[in-house]
């Protein structure tokens, strides 16, 4: 918004600093950002004389494509977003607006977005850990985010209860994956308990035994913990 960046300019002037900014382009996520093309150019021209704002370039996030399961459809959708961003970059440069940084691509799209030779910066964050979600969404990094729980109860040979509920391991977006157990049928969570349902009997795990989960979605898990080991 124009009034927001004008306020940023006044604050920067007060503290005698220059702010580096990227304008966000809405390439299909429909969450924030300017529409591609002429609206971006118009905005740049409206703020180009702000003394304490340094325009560095553009950013976009094709997050609406991250969870697309069909590989061909995912490539097509990301291509459409990249084309909008590329056309906007070209329009700005043709009108004398320097575009130094072009930022985009996320943990669920970087393997495709990076192939377009457009982006100067990849925004992927969660993929440094890789959880169940990003593994499903095409991340190629090795999973490295796990949570250790304890078995608290064995009500039956086909059911395992752990001390891991929503307070430590959220499961409402993407379910965490129990490790080292065969024939897991499903997992469910309440506030303070995790329940693992098995397709066949397992009598080896007993109360007090450790059991590791691969985190379902790091974004809604990491902030709950003060320390990573």
Describe these PLM feature segments.
Residues 1-5, 107-108:
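Short beta->alpha connector loops
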Residues 3-11, 15-16:
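Active-site-adjacent beta->alpha loops and helix N-cap segments on the catalytic face
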Residues 155-229:
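C-terminal accessory subdomain/extension
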Residues 19-20, 26-139:
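Active-site loop/helix belt of alpha/beta enzymes
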Residues 76, 108-182:
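Active-site loop ensemble at the mouth of alpha/beta enzyme cores that anchors a bound cofactor
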Residues 81, 140-142, 184-188:
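Short Gly/Pro-enriched turn/cap motifs at secondary-structure boundaries
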